[in-house]
Amino acid sequence: MRHGHGLRKLNRTSSHRLAMLQNMMNSLIEHEAIKTTLPKAKELRRVIEPMITLAKEDSVANRRLAFNRLRDRDSVTKLFNDLGPRFKTRPGGYTRILKMGFRVGDNAPMAYVELVDRAETPEVSSTEA
């Protein structure tokens, strides 16, 4: 019986799934908000939250563990220098999933995944001359 094995396979092979989640983690760390399908967003949340928790304590061992998962030096640097200190006092729940309707082509449920304490970019108001 498969009790307690709630891994979403996302209709991919294990290597494809791991590579996809690795790319999505790197994109989320770089941009702090991404748009994806809802099942991918829920699976991304399961892998990115432990990475941010790992980054709260900066050590060589933790950086090596993060690099083993991310395989991107810039992402590891931003994770430990920016995101780790930012979420130091937060005991979890670093991401937010916002449902945003359905995709036009195949009606797949779409969602935004964003970091909770993301610095909001100010709206640029256009003035008519």
UniProtKB/Swiss-Prot annotation:
Q: Which InterPro entries does the protein's record reference?
A: Ribosomal_bL17 (IPR000456), Ribosomal_bL17_CS (IPR047859), Ribosomal_bL17_sf (IPR036373)
Q: Which UniProt keywords apply?
A: Ribonucleoprotein, Ribosomal protein
Q: Name one GO molecular function term.
A: structural constituent of ribosome
**Which chain positions lie within coiled-coil regions?**
none
Q: Name one GO cellular component term.
A: cytosolic large ribosomal subunit
Which BP terms from GO are recorded? translation
Report the sequence similarity comment from the record. Belongs to the bacterial ribosomal protein bL17 family.
PANTHER family in UniProt: LARGE RIBOSOMAL SUBUNIT PROTEIN BL17M, RIBOSOMAL PROTEIN L17
This protein's assembly is summarised as: Part of the 50S ribosomal subunit. Contacts protein L32.
Q: What is this protein called?
A: Large ribosomal subunit protein bL17
- Which lineage do the record's taxonomy fields give for this organism? Bacteria, Pseudomonadati, Pseudomonadota, Betaproteobacteria, Burkholderiales
The gene from which this protein is expressed is: rplQ
